[in-house]
Structure formats: C-alpha cells, structure tokens
Amino acid sequence: MAKKITGYIKLQVKAAQANPSPPIGPALGQRGLNIMEFCKAFNAQTQGVEPGLPLPVVITVFADKSFTFEVKTPPAAVLLMKAAGLPKGSGRPNTVKVGKVSEAQIEDIAKTKMPDLNTQDIESAKRSVRGTARSMGLTVEG
C-alpha cells in the first residue's frame, strides 16, 4: 500500500548549501521531519550544481514523518541575471533597461528550463524566457 501524503513544502534552497537554519529548519521542524537528513540528502544531490545557485525544491511529506523531495531547475530570472552579469533586475522594467541578453543565451536558458516547463516545444520555452527577461528590464538582442 502506498504511503499517505500529508502535505507538500516548497522552498528555494541554495545548491549544496542546505543547513538547519531558516527557512529550512522551521519549515521541516513544524512537520516533525528530520532536518539533518534532508540537508545531507539535498547537499549530496546538488553536489554537481554551481554552489549558491538557488534551486526550487518540493518536499512531499508522508503520514509516517518520512519524506521525498524533488529538485527543480533554477528560476529563469536567476539564470537571466547570471547571463547578463547583473546583481538584480530593473525596478521599472518598462522604462529603465538594465542589461542585454543574446538570443543564444535565451535558447540555452530555455533548454535548461525545459524539464520544468509545461511545454515540449523549444520555441514556446524561448517565448516564456523572453517574457521573463522583458519583465526584468532586460533587452533581448537577435
């Protein structure tokens, strides 16, 4: 028989840098989960990813206080800021443009994000990433 799911926890955790401090500790602690077990497993699974890159993670909590987790791809906004070499996006994206990204960079980011997007078409994924870039005040060249 399958385990009974009691809930889901969604967090953004820096790759290979999970520790029991907030936000991880309180989120897992109030559900009675083993915090160190999650931290060790997450850090081991994200070893190959660039350290410090924020990764969304969905933790499935079961009735017997066990859990599983799924690590998603980094947010498109983070990948775009990294590609443009910016610390953050524009405060007024329609009037103040803060940087530029090339069409090739957009395609690379779209390919990276494909597993988490609800499309199988690379063109749709590129449109989604372009929209994120526009909303951050980035200009797409090419």
From Swiss-Prot:
Record PTM text: One or more lysine residues are methylated.
Keywords associated with the record: Methylation, Ribonucleoprotein, Ribosomal protein, RNA-binding, rRNA-binding
Protein name: Large ribosomal subunit protein uL11
Example of a GO biological process term: translation
GO cellular component: cytosolic large ribosomal subunit
Organism: Acidithiobacillus ferrooxidans (strain ATCC 23270 / DSM 14882 / CIP 104768 / NCIMB 8455)
Disulphide bridges: none
Function according to Swiss-Prot or TrEMBL: Forms part of the ribosomal stalk which helps the ribosome interact with GTP-bound translation factors.
Subunit structure: Part of the ribosomal stalk of the 50S ribosomal subunit. Interacts with L10 and the large rRNA to form the base of the stalk. L10 forms an elongated spine to which L12 dimers bind in a sequential fashion forming a multimeric L10(L12)X complex.
Pfam families assigned: Ribosomal_L11, Ribosomal_L11_N
